[in-house]
Amino acid sequence: MQQLIAEITKGQLKTDLPSFRPGDTLRVHVKVVEGTRERIQLFEGVVIKRRGGGISETFTVRKISYGVGVERTFPVHTPRIAKIEVLRRGKVRRAKLYYLRNLRGKKARIKEIR
């Protein structure tokens, strides 16, 4: 049974993903279906969490939109994601950056890896 599940999920995994970690700034191209039309919507922000493995792996991206913090969680291998771009590599010492939720302005900045 376990082998059957592994074979099925193997075909669903994406192979064209860039490597990214918490602290990196991403631009996620998401396919949005509105009625019969399909368009690409961009979501740009900092990765605050990456969890799971295999087909069930997810990551959470946080951005500030009009002064309000917005977090969106994406499955890594979903067909709804058209493309993931890594804009900046951030240097952080934690795997989960939940502390960014309480920081505002310049305190919420992350150092960039050169």
Swiss-Prot record:
<dbReference type="GO" id="GO:0003735">
    <property type="term" value="F:structural constituent of ribosome"/>
</dbReference>
<comment type="function">
    <text>This protein is located at the 30S-50S ribosomal subunit interface and may play a role in the structure and function of the aminoacyl-tRNA binding site.</text>
</comment>
<comment type="similarity">
    <text>Belongs to the bacterial ribosomal protein bL19 family.</text>
</comment>
<dbReference type="InterPro" id="IPR018257">
    <property type="entry name" value="Ribosomal_bL19_CS"/>
</dbReference>
<dbReference type="InterPro" id="IPR001857">
    <property type="entry name" value="Ribosomal_bL19"/>
</dbReference>
<dbReference type="InterPro" id="IPR008991">
    <property type="entry name" value="Translation_prot_SH3-like_sf"/>
</dbReference>
<dbReference type="Pfam" id="PF01245">
    <property type="entry name" value="Ribosomal_L19"/>
</dbReference>
<dbReference type="GO" id="GO:0006412">
    <property type="term" value="P:translation"/>
</dbReference>
<dbReference type="InterPro" id="IPR038657">
    <property type="entry name" value="Ribosomal_bL19_sf"/>
</dbReference>
<dbReference type="GO" id="GO:0022625">
    <property type="term" value="C:cytosolic large ribosomal subunit"/>
</dbReference>
<protein>
    <recommendedName>
        <fullName>Large ribosomal subunit protein bL19</fullName>
    </recommendedName>
</protein>
<keyword id="KW-0689">Ribosomal protein</keyword>
<keyword id="KW-0687">Ribonucleoprotein</keyword>
